[in-house]
Amino acid sequence: MSGFLSGDPRPFRSVRPFAAFLVLAAPFCVSHTALAQTSATDDPTEHLDVPGRRPLDRPAPVGSRLGLSLRDTPATVDTISRDTALQRGALSAEAAADMLPGITSGGSPGNPGQFVLRGFTANEITVLHDGTYLGPVTMVNRPQNSFNLQDIEVLQGPASVLYGQGAVGGVVDERSRDPVLGRRSADLLASYGSFDTWNAGIGVNQPISRDAAVLVDVSRSSSNGYVPGSDPASLDVTGALLWHAPHRVTLRLGLDVLRDQLSSYYGTPLVPAASASFFGGIAGGLLSSGTGLAIARDSLWQNYNVRDFTTTSTSLRPTLRLDWRATDRLTIHEKAYFFYAARRWQNAESYSFIPPGTDAMDAEGNAIATGSIARDRFHVFQNQHQVGDTLDATLDGSLFGLSNRVVAGIDGSYLRFIRDRGFPDAPYADAVSLSDPDRGEYGAFAGDLPSRKSPTDLGDLALFAEDVLSLTRTLKLVTGFRYDWLWLGRDNFNQDGSFNARTSFSGTYHPNNGRVGLVWNATRDITLYGSWTSADDPPGANIFLANRGQFDRLSHAQQAEIGLKAALPDGRADLTLSAYHIERNRMLVATGPDTVSTAGSQHSNGIETQANWRPAAHWTVSANAAWTRARYGSFHPDAATDATGNRPPDVPALVGNLWIVRDHVAGTPVDLGGGWRHVGDRAGDYADTLSLKAYDTVDLFAAYHLRPAVTLYGRIGNLLDRHYVQWADVSYPTEVILGAPRSFSLSLQASF
């Protein structure tokens, strides 16, 4: 397959000399900089981020515009820094977020970068980039390299009061790095590992005056993939210019450019258990099925997609942020942005096993042999243009003689999304062998072209306000409100170009949401809180895929949460604990073969906790766990399926992480660390007839400090080589996504 950056048959292969250069050059570069700074880095932990440590007094931007600390935010906010992610070997934002309480991630190439939070998933989760919403996660999200990020912040639970429609289960904010004034620095990363996986990155922070600095981060990745021939690759360039202008004005101009190619691995097909014996037997420990389905051993790590697959995207996002401290009590903030993305998929996505006694034909009218894997063809081309602006003011003052801070503002955006798609007239395009697939080419099939076009326009204008009132020295009342004027228009065109009035529609919606929270600092180190918050989101359909009758009104969710945040006085340990209940109503349900209504519901209860502890010098321990009980109320995802009382797909009841790190073992420049992760059983479909087995993975790393700021890492991922199902995409009911097997990597990281 031709690379989309060059004619190289392996995209991004040029990352290899780039990475090799970093490996060879970094020690020499640092020998003249880091060595000269030895006196400033004698503390052995100076260059080492403390895994999982979350000082409760630092701000939590994703949780509020009020500038509240983690301690004073009446919600659960979790953060993982770039340094922690890279130390643990998490090179993507999804892998890093998985280390936070209660979060799992997954998705197929058609719906990449999905998250599960508090019993909700897919478009019920809002993913932000530097605080900006770019569309439903299943349509617009792409894996992000963690090298380019400052941190990942997660707000658990409904958050429409802050970010508008869609934020029911929570918000994941992937935040880019900011320039630092007055300090010249550079960061290097070079990594090679199993499956011919390369990662490389370079970041430079350069002051250009006393009041201005520029930062540029560039990262590249390339891999054959743990499923051979899946070939994921990416190039991510992020940069920012920071200027402290006169008159107490700060300007930040940012740019994010991404070109990527997603993995071509759409899944491993399910087969009748009785047929698996002809293909190496059943691969045990992966799933159980009430309808007699299993995974055949011969299908493990097979790629059934076409060789000339397409899963590429190019995106561009410039941003401008202005902060003006007009007076000692009044600050004005403005953020403007533009976003463009072009995405292309052209693949064989669905794989169906043809059991004995079945008559099936391909698109050419040929009989498909039983025991084969029948494939479809599907192409989707997307173009997205979006502009937006947020303007708000923060005022510090008093209310009824009590200390008070209020934020009020306006948020506006316009999004134009054009989706072209096509597929053959026949149910199956062709077929391949289960155990030794000849992947073939995409080809041409009757009915695939011309494309069916569906442009969508989404406009949003919102008024919002937040307030924190200090009722006493230890008691704070935190409130918020947001009113949206949301306009959605979707035009569908038939293959012949004629307008489809039956499915096209337009509508106006007026969601309004709020938050009320009470925060009590019981002692200097112990805080208790309780809160209520709400959210609105599309009732069942993707906002870019909704047709007439599927979007008459928004669904509505409410959450009640209580929690505790505490730390030891000496700062050696901190703990957060929360319990919540979420109700979501007005979900889209099928009431007949061609009729729907918004009568569905879902509820979720859970407990989450995170603890970080330094039991002794050179030791750090980070642990978290989350228990979730999520169930549908009345819910019929289609006319033939009654999911009432069932678990939502891909939602585990229990998720846990444990990381232990020992730095400078026995006084040597060697660090050792290990992590354990548990993910519980999950439903694999709406009917809850497919159950994905629980799994545990163990990761290990050893680090050798060549210089105070140069570290060589060796890692083993999935040490016990546990085979497991990571994800079941309900859009592809005949297949599941397997998780990565055991892997090894060697990397060099340097900062100077």
Predicted features, each with a name:
Residues H244-P246, Q384, S403-V407, D411-L415, ...:
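Structural signature of Gram-negative outer-membrane beta-barrels, strongest in the C-terminal barrel
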Residues F4, R677-D685, A703-F752:
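C-terminal beta-signal and adjacent terminal beta-strands/loops
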Residues D323-R325, R329-Y337, A341-E349, N521, ...:
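Membrane-embedded beta-barrel scaffold of Gram-negative outer-membrane proteins
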Residues T474, H581-E583, T598-Y686, L720, ...:
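Gram-negative outer-membrane beta-barrel transporters
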Residues F147-Q150, Q156, V161-G239, A245-V249, ...:
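Outer-membrane beta-barrel translocator/receptor signature
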Residues S105, V116, T132-Q156, R175, ...:
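Short acidic/polar hinge/loop motifs at secondary-structure boundaries
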Residues S221, G225, T238-H244, R248-D323, ...:
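Acidic/polar loop-and-plug regions of large Gram-negative outer-membrane beta-barrel proteins
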Residues P318-Y340, I373-F493, T576:
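Face-selective signature of the C-terminal outer-membrane beta-barrel domain
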